[in-house]
């Protein structure tokens, strides 16, 4: 049975673990790949103490980010309705469609806060009217906004 060595990861390693994880790996894998490329360090009491401090700091940082997302969610709900103006033809059919970029621009205009368009899930919109749109603000925080599509 082969001996395994314990290392602490300095960064996320695919199929092995995340930054700060204590993992057991084959000695050759540690010696030839993880340690030389700075992806891990051998386990010592000092390293374990550092990992504890780093995890506490990361937890604080994540809590602050989540609180910021919750505050932004409250702001979105308070505003309530966002409007996107699009050119229409007969029977209020849009020329083109409403994209997540259009919604992001409407949110940025109303809130003065930048949001990544990739975090907005827009249903297929081809007519004027009112629609529900999902906005992902954080891994654990989502907001549902009302989008009003009007013609100009």
Swiss-Prot record:
Disulfide bond residue pairs: none
InterPro entries: Ribosomal_bL9, Ribosomal_bL9/RNase_H1_N, Ribosomal_bL9_bac/chp, Ribosomal_bL9_C, Ribosomal_bL9_C_sf, Ribosomal_bL9_N, Ribosomal_bL9_N_sf
Superkingdom of this protein's organism: Bacteria
Pfam families: Ribosomal_L9_C, Ribosomal_L9_N
Keywords, comma-separated and alphabetical: Ribonucleoprotein, Ribosomal protein, RNA-binding, rRNA-binding
GO biological process: one example: translation
GO molecular function, one term: rRNA binding
GO cellular component: ribonucleoprotein complex; ribosome
Family from the record: Belongs to the bacterial ribosomal protein bL9 family.
Reported function: Binds to the 23S rRNA.
Record's protein name: Large ribosomal subunit protein bL9
Organism: Prochlorococcus marinus (strain MIT 9313)
Gene name of the encoded protein: rplI
């Amino acid at each position: 049975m082969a001996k395994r060595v314990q290392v602490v990861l300095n960064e996320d390693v695919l199929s092995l673990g995340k930054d700060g994880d204590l993992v057991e790996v084959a000695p050759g894998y540690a010696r030839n790949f993880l340690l030389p490329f700075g992806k891990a360090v051998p386990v010592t009491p000092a390293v374990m103490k550092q990992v504890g401090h780093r995890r506490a700091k990361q937890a604080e940082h994540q809590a602050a980010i989540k609180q910021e997302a919750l505050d932004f969610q409250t702001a979105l709900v308070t505003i309530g309705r966002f409007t996107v103006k699009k050119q229409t033809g007969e029977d209020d059919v849009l020329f083109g469609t409403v994209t997540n970029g259009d919604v992001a621009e409407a949110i940025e205009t109303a809130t003065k806060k930048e949001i990544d368009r990739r975090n907005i899930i827009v249903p297929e919109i081809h007519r004027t009217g009112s629609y529900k749109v999902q906005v992902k603000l954080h891994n654990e925080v989502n907001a549902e906004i009302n989008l009003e599509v009007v013609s100009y």
